[in-house]
Amino acid sequence: MSTTTLTRREQRAKAQHFIDTLEGTAFPNSKRIYVTGSQHDIRVPMREIQLSPTLISGTKDHPQYEENEAIPVYDTSGPYGDPNIAINIQQGLAKLRQPWIEARADVETLSNRSSAYTRERLTDEGLNALRFTGLLTPKRAKAGHCVTQLHYARNGIVTPEMAFIAIRENMGRERIRSEVLRHQHPGENFGARLPENITPEFVRDEVAAGRAIIPANINHPESEPMIIGRNFLVKVNANIGNSAVTSSIEEEVEKLVWATRWGADTVMDLSTGRYIHETREWILRNSPVPIGTVPIYQALEKVNGIAEDLTWEAFRDTLLEQAEQGVDYFTIHAGVLLRYVPMTAKRLTGIVSRGGSIMAKWCLSHHKENFLFEHFREICEICAAYDVSLSLGDGLRPGSIQDANDDAQFAELHTLGELTKIAWEYDVQVMIEGPGHVPMQMIRRNMTEELEHCHEAPFYTLGPLTTDIAPGYDHFTSGIGAAMIGWFGCAMLCYVTPKEHLGLPNKEDVKQGLITYKIAAHAADLAKGHPGAQIRDNAMSKARFEFRWEDQFNLALDPFTARAWHDETLPHESGKVAHFCSMCGPKFCSMKISQEVRDYAAAQTIEVGMANMSESFRAKGGEIYLKREEA
């Protein structure tokens, strides 16, 4: 952990330098490849990890090698992972999806912004220095049309987005020929449907059934299509955002780029401080992944932070503002009903969701039903016009182990299931948010309740944290629960950083949270038996057994840390070819011994070899461990 503390001015200057000097960068010994589709001129970006050959025979002067296949992996970094693409944050990313959106001929360009707040911001000359210069002219559905991926799927249309996703989810595994790499243990998928090959039609079918969503606002054409669903790879979300206390636009853009580099499948902008509108514009125009928000946070800012002063009109204006900027999914706490609030009175930690507490306070102060619930159909109409997915928020999630799986939590969950059916009437895509703080033995019930009462809509959970005793390490406590619930069927995991419960995460915290959650998601994919999930593990194990250190570093989720820790004790280049590491040394390396036994057995008959080894073992006193000079 770094002990260097920068001033606010230094932090902003450092972030600005990062943005100004940003270039497309590949991971060590990796290259960007594009897998093409058979339709729509689709090119799906992936990262291909190049591996060194294996020494199989020969002499020191004339060694014989066998090539190792390159390993393709899922890549969320967008243009930032391609050294051949010029990056300019001031201009934003290329509009990948714009031709697809326009070809459907069901959208119209707006002559003016629908949000009064947006119009006010655009005419404020005092904001010129902060404003993104290449603003898009927003689009919305033509009258009588619906532009959601769910609408297309239900009408039997395979969109370019669906075709893109099918290629992406297969992760290039069709390229792998080695039986060693293709070997995979059977999984336990708890009823999930995991086809051997993901086709565009399968993607369409899952979206049409509501079991998966494609967050893809028509006003965020820069995003690369991805899917969230139980029958696909487990995804990870990263939260960023400023607060009234700290952070700036440049720091949040830096965190966005950093998050996509380290594997964020989506990013939520949870900004609550100044310049929320301007910060979000910079993030959207430079994001290759879907962006989510919690609109009630900004609506609260518009009424000076006084929850009682919130109105449907202010909230509706915020939805229009964000939808026309390009937000891909909204977290809406419409399930926090007035009658559920008293259920939380006996909790140890009450209501811990910011959105949930805001709506609970509004309900109690007015003694009226939650206006998000009352106006839910109007919310759906707005979402359908821009293809904004709904993430139905768990405002009553447990904030402590003691409060897990209580009546308030599940009452809200059942209401979210009812709201899901309403959203589907409007062809609006839906996922369900989940806890929270749940001990391990109580986690699976959360998944089974969600599948039953929310009609198999994708589940999206914050962890859950499996213990409350580790502030500073809650990425660990929650990573355990995340791996478990991902295995049980959760579609997306919201990361937790080391700063959870302690402060706003910085760039390094974002990385630590993401690495932890990529481990959890991958472990869940392995346990489910997702086709091809074990290829990278097999490649790593083979490299480890063959002492190909460079390949071990490069196959790691974090190559830089793997290399740095190896080099702490074996920094010289000779350490990169040594047949041991500093853990055991040359005499006690189990893999080196295994190789020697294997070579010995290959040179002689098994019976003779075992007899000789047995005789040698007895001659040396029958001891498992020997002093170095005896060995």
UniProtKB/Swiss-Prot annotation:
Enzyme Commission number(s): 4.1.99.17
Its recorded reaction(s) are: 5-amino-1-(5-phospho-beta-D-ribosyl)imidazole + S-adenosyl-L-methionine = 4-amino-2-methyl-5-(phosphooxymethyl)pyrimidine + CO + 5'-deoxyadenosine + formate + L-methionine + 3 H(+)
Its BP terms in the Gene Ontology are: thiamine biosynthetic process; thiamine diphosphate biosynthetic process
Tell me the enzyme class.
lyase
Q: Which residues bind [4Fe-4S] cluster?
A: 581, 584, 589
Q: State how it assembles.
A: Homodimer.
Identify the HAMAP family for this entry. ThiC
What is the purpose of this protein?
Catalyzes the synthesis of the hydroxymethylpyrimidine phosphate (HMP-P) moiety of thiamine from aminoimidazole ribotide (AIR) in a radical S-adenosyl-L-methionine (SAM)-dependent reaction.
For this entry, the protein name equals Phosphomethylpyrimidine synthase
Species of the source: Salmonella arizonae (strain ATCC BAA-731 / CDC346-86 / RSK2980)
